[in-house]
A protein has these predicted regions:
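Active-site neighborhood of HAD-like aspartate-dependent phosphohydrolases
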Residues: 1-43
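Short helix-capping segments at alpha-helix termini
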Residues: 30-31, 72-79, 109, 132-136, ...
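Asp-based, Mg2+/Mn2+-dependent phosphohydrolase catalytic module
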Residues: 1-4, 9, 100, 104-107, ...
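An amphipathic alpha-helix signature
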Residues: 22, 35, 39, 59, ...
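A metal-dependent, Asp-based hydrolase signature
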Residues: 32, 46-84
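Short, acidic loop-to-helix structural element flanking the phosphoryl-transfer center
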Residues: 59-60, 78-115, 125, 153
Length: 222
C-alpha cells in the first residue's frame, strides 16, 4: 500500500489539550467535570443536526450547550460573564506535548499536512501559532465550509476535494473513534491516537494504525 500524501488532523482533543477547560468551569463556580459534559453535549447536538440534514457553527452550539448546563448552578458570576469566560478558554488552549515533534517529523518527510475540524479555523490558527507549528500546515480546514459535520461522509469528501486528492490518498488522524469510523467509511486511511490506552469500540470500523502519541505518526505513515 502506498504512503498517503495528505495527513488530515482533527484538532479538538487530537492536537489541542482541552484539560484546562475544567479550570475555566471551576473559576465560574461550576464543577470541573462539567467541562467534559459540556463538550460531549455540544458534539451530540452537532451530530443530531447533521443526522437531520441541518448544521450549525461550533461556537453557537458550544454557547447553547453551555447555557443549558450552567442553568441552576450556583455560579460566582452572572451567566453571560460565565459563558464569556469559559468560551474564551478555547482561544488559550495549547497543543499536547507530543504534537510539535510529530508535526515536524511528518512535515520533514514530505507529507502534506492539513486539518479538518468541527470547530473554527480561527481557533486552530491561534493554537498552532503559539506552538510554532502553523507553517507546517498547508491548509486549515473546517466543516463550517463543508456544510456538514464530521463524521458525515460529505465532510471528508470536502477535504479530499479541497486538497485535490482521492480520499484513499489521505490518512485521518484523530483521538475520537467516531471520527476514525467516519473517515474509514468515506474511503480514507486512519490513525487513532490513543494517549490513554483505552480499548477501541468494536462497533466502529477499526483504524489502520493505532498510536500512543502524535510523535509516533511519522513512523507508521510517513
Amino acid at each position: 500500500m502506498s504512503t498517503p500524501s495528505v495527513v488530515v488532523f482533527d484538532v479538538n482533543e487530537t492536537l489541542s489539550d482541552l484539560t484546562p477547560m475544567g479550570q475555566r468551569f471551576a473559576e465560574v463556580g461550576a464543577p470541573e467535570w462539567t467541562a467534559k459534559l459540556w463538550f460531549a453535549s455540544l458534539l451530540r447536538d452537532g451530530f443530531a443536526l447533521t443526522a437531520a440534514g441541518a448544521t450549525e457553527r461550533f461556537s453557537a452550539l458550544g454557547e447553547g450547550a453551555l447555557r443549558s448546563i450552567l442553568a441552576g448552578l450556583p455560579l460566582s458570576r452572572d451567566t453571560d460573564a460565565a459563558v464569556e469566560h469559559i468560551m474564551g478558554g478555547f482561544l488559550e488552549l495549547q497543543v499536547h506535548p507530543d504534537v510539535p515533534e510529530g508535526v515536524r517529523s511528518l512535515s520533514a518527510s514530505g507529507a502534506r499536512l492539513v486539518t479538518l475540524t468541527n470547530g473554527s479555523t480561527e481557533v486552530a490558527e491561534g493554537i498552532f501559532a503559539v506552538a510554532g507549528i502553523r507553517h507546517h500546515f498547508e491548509r486549515l480546514l473546517s466543516v463550517e465550509d463543508a456544510g456538514v459535520w464530521k463524521p458525515a461522509p460529505g465532510a471528508y469528501a470536502y477535504a479530499a476535494s479541497t486538497c485535490s486528492v482521492d480520499p484513499a490518498d489521505m490518512v485521518l488522524v484523530a483521538v475520537h473513534p467516531w471520527d476514525i469510523d467516519g473517515a474509514k467509511r468515506a474511503g480514507l486511511r486512519t490513525a487513532w491516537v490513543n494517549r490513554e490506552g483505552r480499548p477501541y469500540p468494536g462497533y466502529f470500523l477499526a483504524p489502520d494504525h493505532s498510536i500512543a502519541a502524535v510523535s509516533e505518526l511519522a513512523g507508521v505513515v510517513g
